[in-house]
């Protein structure tokens, strides 16, 4: 029973979601030549760091979690694990994860993990989430870190491919997160969390969602234009983006915003999974003949 509680406090669903993006970034950079020990070290290292961040987040948010229907039964809220024990647990997970990334992957992968962790725990969870409508924007940077870590674990450098991944996954986070805030509107309102739909209204949030999906669509195409991914990826990326944008535009005419937002959220997961799979299998080696190479 205790094992289940220690697992739950790490938010395994979030860990799994991040692993999909780590794998996408790693296999994109590997280009068919997979270093399996490096692959395992990277996956486990990122999983431990994400788990650590989630436990710290649970510790920090335990007061507002009590006010939200979705989170009122979390382990720390119910007192199934003490706050002091959770801090020790989170610290140990983080140390193990960072060590694995440093020694098993490379220092760059580790430092990217540190930056993502600091943004999520130190900037987003401790301050921005409670005090700023821009909390989601800041948090999106940490959400994009796993894909970039996976990529840089292979390359050992932050190149244009890593920058494109950072853009794709950061931009994806925004409509994904705003959709959650819309269908969980009352929860966020009750906890006084200043997310965009609560502060500016759902209509404004819909405008932002549409704009971010357009920006996301452009970013996804950059992988192919830069010569990092092939035409199969390009077709899937375009199809996913157009469909997601269509869903967003239909939001202006729906009768029930909550049902629409839940569907938009659900498709966001399908979208990022499809892109991660396609960049894993339809990779390319960039050369000087690509459009982006010519521009840059």
Swiss-Prot record:
Pathway: Porphyrin-containing compound metabolism; heme O biosynthesis; heme O from protoheme: step 1/1. The chain crosses the membrane at residues 10-28, 38-56, 79-97, 108-126, 198-216, 229-247, 269-287. Residues 1-9, 57-78, 127-197, 248-268 are cytoplasmic. It is found in: Cell inner membrane. It catalyses: heme b + (2E,6E)-farnesyl diphosphate + H2O = Fe(II)-heme o + diphosphate. Pfam families: UbiA. InterPro entries: Protohaem_IX_farnesylTrfase (IPR006369), UbiA_prenyltransferase (IPR000537), UbiA_prenylTrfase_CS (IPR030470), UbiA_sf (IPR044878). Its EC number is 2.5.1.141. It is an enzyme of class 2 (transferase). Belongs to the UbiA prenyltransferase family. Protoheme IX farnesyltransferase subfamily. PANTHER family: PROTOHEME IX FARNESYLTRANSFERASE, MITOCHONDRIAL. Converts heme B (protoheme IX) to heme O by substitution of the vinyl group on carbon 2 of heme B porphyrin ring with a hydroxyethyl farnesyl side group. This is Protoheme IX farnesyltransferase.
């Amino acid at each position: 029973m205790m094992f289940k509680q220690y697992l739950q406090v790490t938010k395994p669903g979030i860990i799994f979601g991040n692993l999909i993006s780590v794998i996408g970034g790693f296999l994109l950079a590997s280009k068919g030549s997979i270093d399996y020990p490096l692959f395992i070290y990277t996956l486990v290292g990122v999983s431990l760091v994400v788990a650590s961040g989630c436990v710290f987040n649970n510790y920090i948010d335990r007061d507002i979690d009590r006010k939200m229907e979705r989170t009122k039964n979390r382990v720390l809220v119910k007192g199934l694990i003490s706050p002091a024990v959770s801090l020790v647990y989170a610290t140990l997970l983080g140390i193990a994860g960072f060590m694995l990334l440093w020694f098993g992957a490379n220092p760059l992968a580790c430092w990217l993990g540190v930056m993502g962790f600091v943004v999520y725990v130190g900037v987003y969870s401790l301050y921005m989430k409670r005090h700023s409508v821009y909390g989601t924007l800041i948090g999106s940077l940490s959400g994009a870190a796993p894909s970039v870590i996976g990529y840089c674990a292979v390359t050992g450098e932050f190149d244009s491919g890593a920058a494109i991944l950072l853009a794709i996954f950061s931009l994806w986070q925004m409509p994904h997160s705003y959709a959650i805030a819309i269908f969980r509107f009352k929860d966020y309102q009750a906890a006084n969390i200043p997310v965009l739909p609560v502060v500016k209204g759902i209509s404004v949030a819909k405008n932002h969602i549409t704009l971010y999906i357009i920006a996301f669509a452009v970013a996804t195409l950059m992988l192919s234009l830069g010569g990092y991914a092939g035409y199969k990826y390009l077709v899937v990326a375009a199809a996913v983006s157009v469909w997601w944008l269509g869903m967003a535009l239909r939001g202006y005419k729906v009768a029930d915003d909550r049902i629409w937002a839940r569907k938009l959220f659900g498709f966001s997961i399908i979208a990022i999974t499809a892109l991660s799979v396609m960049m894993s299998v339809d990779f390319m080696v960039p050369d000087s003949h690509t459009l982006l190479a010519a521009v840059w």
